[in-house]
């Protein structure tokens, strides 16, 4: 049966395929096994991360919120002021505290440790999202949205920096990207530590809305000359949070359903999850009927549930392949 929702998804996908000049998607393995299902209307703005005992945590309404294994919701950490969330290999929650402009680690007992709050004496902008590689190095983005008067981080020529940083296990911090990306947002390192994907989401008029890939060396440093454009959202809202599945496919939250003129249009296929093959080819799209799809994360008992945050709401989609989880 061709439902109205299914029709709109197919129409959006047809537009996407035309834009991307993709002609052989039918030959690709299935990506999604269900339509998006709304789980919550409010309280899930960003950073969905799964824990096998706790359930799902999200950033929303100034707190870290919890949706337990039975679906019951509660506040996990009040007044957290966070955006991106990620559990490390020791079960500690590492968060981008964009209100306090720092990266914080929260132990299971609730003890919080600030990992970094400045670089070379300059306070960060708004730490947004993070990823962890196989050597337990933490990479995070530091964009600036809204007013820019409070920005401290600048290069030696006085230019403002919205950069990407890496925290090593010994606590040292290095800036690995400065001006190569306009306004870095979501990011992820591949499981083999060979590549770093960075979402360039500059929502200013004429800003970049692009997905980039950088090759990484053994020390976790990007080869800036390797910078490769994976996809360009042009004038609509660009890429935000992203995750990988166990086949190396990349799921990227992007787009919007209502134009924010003159800065951003609402061109088809609009807001949802864009899926790229391991080779960087756009292979699928599923629409989310809420403005601004912000992030996604895999979870569930079998790892085949993709949780999606969009405009404060929370959605779930069943996938054919489990998501990659830090182990």
Regions found by a protein language model. Give the residues of each.
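Compositionally biased, intrinsically disordered low-complexity regions
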Residues: 10, 25-26
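Sequence-structural signature of mature extracellular/luminal beta-sheet repeat domains
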Residues: 27-327
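Short hydrophobic transmembrane-like helices used for membrane targeting/insertion
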Residues: 1-4, 19-25
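Bacterial N-terminal signal peptides that target proteins for export
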Residues: 2-12
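Bacterial N-terminal signal peptides
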Residues: 11-21
């Amino acid at each position: 049966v061709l439902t109205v929702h299914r029709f709109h998804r197919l129409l959006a996908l047809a537009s996407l395929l035309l834009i991307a000049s993709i002609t052989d998607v039918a030959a690709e393995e299935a990506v999604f096994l269900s339509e998006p299902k709304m789980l919550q209307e409010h309280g899930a703005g960003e950073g969905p991360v799964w824990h096998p005992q706790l359930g799902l945590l999200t950033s929303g309404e100034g707190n870290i919120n919890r949706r337990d294994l039975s679906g019951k919701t509660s506040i996990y950490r009040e007044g957290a002021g966070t955006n991106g969330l990620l559990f490390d290999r020791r079960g500690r929650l590492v968060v981008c505290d964009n209100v306090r402009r720092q990266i914080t680690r929260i132990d299971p007992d609730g003890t919080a440790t600030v990992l970094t709050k400045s670089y070379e004496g300059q306070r960060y902008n708004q730490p947004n999202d993070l990823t962890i590689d196989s050597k337990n190095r933490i990479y995070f983005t530091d964009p600036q949205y809204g007013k820019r008067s409070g920005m401290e981080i600048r290069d030696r020529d006085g230019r403002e920096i919205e950069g990407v940083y890496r925290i090593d296990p010994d606590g040292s911090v290095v800036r690995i990207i400065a001006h190569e990306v306009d306004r870095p947002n979501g990011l992820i390192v591949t499981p083999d530590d060979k590549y770093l994907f960075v979402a360039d989401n500059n929502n200013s008029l004429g800003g970049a809305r692009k997905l980039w890939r950088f090759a990484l060396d053994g020390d976790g440093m990007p080869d800036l000359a390797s910078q490769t454009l994976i996809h360009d959202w042009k004038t609509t809202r660009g890429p935000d949070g992203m995750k990988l599945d166990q086949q190396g496919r990349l799921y990227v939250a992007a787009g919007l359903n209502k134009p924010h003129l003159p800065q951003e249009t609402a061109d088809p296929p609009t807001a949802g999850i864009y899926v790229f093959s391991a080779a960087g080819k756009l292979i699928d799209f599923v629409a989310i009927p809420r403005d601004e799809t912000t992030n996604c994360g895999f979870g569930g008992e079998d790892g085949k549930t993709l949780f999606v945050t969009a405009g404060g709401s929370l959605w779930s989609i069943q996938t054919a392949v489990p998501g990659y989880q830090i182990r």
